[in-house]
Amino acid sequence: MPDYMVTLESAWIIKDVKTMDDAISIAIGEAGKRLNPAAKYVEIETGMMVCPLCNKALNCAVVVANTALVGLTLQMKVFRAESEEHAVRIAKSVIGKALRDVPLNVQDVQEL
């Protein structure tokens, strides 16, 4: 049975924040705090998206009225999964239990 690297994206809402850098730091910190006891082997990074006009990479964060929406990328190695779908189910289960009400979407699955 092969191993897989599953990449999920999540959306975090941060209130009472002034700058985008603060929002990103708080979102990564909150995600790490929730994941640490149960799934400390999950890598957390700021989500990136490509500008449709200039094709440059941009942070997935927006601050409006002291409220931020931050996109995070969560990567997890899943060992000995039966298939890609099985690896996704395992990753969503482990990360979803730790993060509870945070929406998760599959971004990428790679066989290792």
Curated annotation (Swiss-Prot):
- This protein's species is Methanosphaerula palustris (strain ATCC BAA-1556 / DSM 19958 / E1-9c)
> Cross-referenced Pfam families, in alphabetical order?
DUF555
The entry assigns this protein to a family as follows: Belongs to the UPF0212 family.
What name does this protein carry?
A: UPF0212 protein Mpal_1084
The protein's superkingdom reads Archaea
